[in-house]
Amino acid sequence: MAQVKAEYDFQSQPNTGELSISAGEVLTVIRENIDGGWIEGRNVRGSVGLFPESYVTPYQASRPPPVLPPPLPPTSSGPPAASSRPFDDWGGASEVAAPPSYGAQHHHQPTPSVPEVTRSSYPSQNDDFDDEWTDEDDEQEPTRPNVQSSIGSNSRRDLSRSHSEHGGPDRGSNKVNKNINRFSNFVKSGVEAYVIGESKTTSQISERHEVVMNNGIIQWKPIQQYYTCIVDKPKKESKLKGLKSFIAYSITSSLTNIQRQVSRRYKHFDWLHEQLSAKYVLIPIPPLPEKQVAGRYEEDLIDHRKHILQLWVNKICRHPVLSQSEVWLHFISCTDEKDWKNGKRRAEKDEYIGGAFLNCITVPHQPLDPNNVDMQVERFQRSVKTSEEAMRVMQERMNMFQKVFAGPVKQNWQKMGSAFKTLQQSFEIDETVASRRLTEALAYTASEYHEIGQVFDAHTKNDMEPVLENLYSYKGTVQNVPDIIQVHKQAVQKFRDSEGRLSSAEAEKMKQRIDAMSYTVIAEVQHQTAEKVEDMKSTMGTYLKKQAMFYQEVATKLTSLAARYD
């Protein structure tokens, strides 16, 4: 196989499938001419990944240097001359090119919507259960900047992909001269390798899923056994003799006859989200609650996070693929520390992630009409775009209602209560029986008006907050849809570009892989569309019922007050 030599250091970004290389390092080329100016290669340690093509030069092992004759004896018996070896030989030469500034301003995405080719290059090396996570506790890390303001104040992921403006070096001048797209998701997710039939896997498939045709509708095979998971009992815990503290949540699943309860931290949820995002490349993973530090142990914050986690768990349980995911089932059921660590390692070394996961999906044999596929995907994309805008407007109005009800409306009711109290005090001077009855009625009215103000405040949390949480969950899920659709479009285009250069047999096999990918995308479109309808029916129906109960409660109080003046 061809080899190349690194001319510059290149530092990989986490969770991208890139491979760090050092100047002078010799690498074996696996695949060249990858979109965006990349090479896939292997280093001497066996790690595989992508690195910029313009950072390396072709390398051929040179022949050993000829054996030189022994040096002539010195002609002088004086002390040896000081060595004239230049400082350059020690790595400090002034002529050594400075490494390029590639990626210096690269914007890191916590959970790319379409993840890396492989995680096997980054296995966990630590056997300690707690220390397998970073030393910084999840509850005490600095708040991540919220770069996705378009999704709302509680958004967690970045809607728009960042693209690096930096490229590789010019070998003559050591300056950047070529733009390299670090977010070539079609390549890095392994989808390109799948499309061209070069997915590299050595292990057997342990998790299989199926797309079926039901009355002409393409969909995931329905769930055979529905189950639920409850996120509850948030509890403050600590480690290192109290130096680090965090909130742990219990998860109780109905999957088995015996309800099993496990305890998980937010950091564990975050790890699971990363595994799901990496493996299920064409499935938008719902968002977790945002990580926050300020007031992290306040009751309202803990309760809010618990509700978002519950929504997240609900969506996973309802998904025909995610609900049967091995890493998910391990997450909700494993109580043994040793088994947990082994399962964690298995997930991190899983070969069937990204594009390779498509090998785990069985689809109908019937070929798909490309035009019909394009039409369905485009319609879904338009639906997502219009729904996002509509939900943004709903989110803004609901936020406004919350502020008004918890602020001016509550205050005005309670100010009216104070006015009734003042009126009551003015009638206390009269000592007649009639005035005494009126005084009692006014005093009770003042108290009830104050209570109605509190009811308006509670309404914002109990009735409005769930709507906002559901809007957050939906928008955080579909924000990944544009990237998924883009990867599908690139796969289809790859086939169209290659079709004329392939034999009929090769073209047919490639078309089958494209069809399998299209079946998967349409099945997911069908699921997401059905979920949106059911979620919105349930959310708005529940909200309006609570609205009616709320106003009935206020009306009942006012009717009762009016009767006191009869």
UniProtKB/Swiss-Prot annotation:
Residues 155-173 have a biased composition (Basic and acidic residues). Residues 362-566 form the BAR domain. Keywords: Cytoplasm, Cytoplasmic vesicle, Lipid-binding, Membrane, SH3 domain. Residues 63-77 have a biased composition (Pro residues). Expressed in vulval precursor cells (VPCs) and apoptotic germ cells. Colocalizes with actin, dyn-1 and rab-5 in early phagosomes. The keyword Disulfide bond does not apply. Residues 227-339 form the PX domain. Changing K494E: Defective recruitment to the phagosome. It is found in: Cytoplasm; Cytoplasmic vesicle, Phagosome membrane. Its main location: cytoplasm. Disruption phenotype: Aberrant vulval development, ectopic vulval induction, retained cell corpses and defective recruitment of dyn-1 and rab-7 to phagosomal surfaces. The BAR and PX domains are required for recruitment to the phagosome. The SH3 domain is involved in phagosome maturation. Belongs to the sorting nexin family. This is Sorting nexin lst-4. It comes from Caenorhabditis elegans. The gene is lst-4.
